[in-house]
Amino acid sequence: MPRGDEQRVVDAFCAWLRQDGWTVETEITFVDILAWKDGTTLLAEAKGITSSPGLDVDTAYGQLLRRMPIEPQHGWRYALVVPEETLKAALRVPQRIRDLLGLDVYSVNQDGAVTLRP
């Protein structure tokens, strides 16, 4: 179970998804957040504010890559969810690569507002 600031990020993202009509599960053994809506499955990793934001974001990318199946799954998307303070580190992976992987980056501000980032 996520702790500290990561829990804040998970809670805000899950609330945002539910408000948009997603069915959401957390505390899954292989991913922080699993959600479904209209034939789309979303697997998300979340990170909070830490003393090593670059390392933690790199770890999250690695976790997501290891969860991706060998063959593409129709309707599957992936997400990295980070606090605004960590966004710069999350966007170091070029947009083109994230697009190829079907991976979106979301940020959560201190008020819990969620934003999809380009």
PLM feature spans:
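Nuclease-adjacent, charged terminal/linker segments that flank catalytic cores
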Residues: 1, 8, 19-22, 85-90, ...
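Long, charge-dense
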Residues: 55, 61, 108-114
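Conserved catalytic cores of phosphodiester-cleaving nucleases, focusing on short active-site segments
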Residues: 33-35, 39-51, 66-67
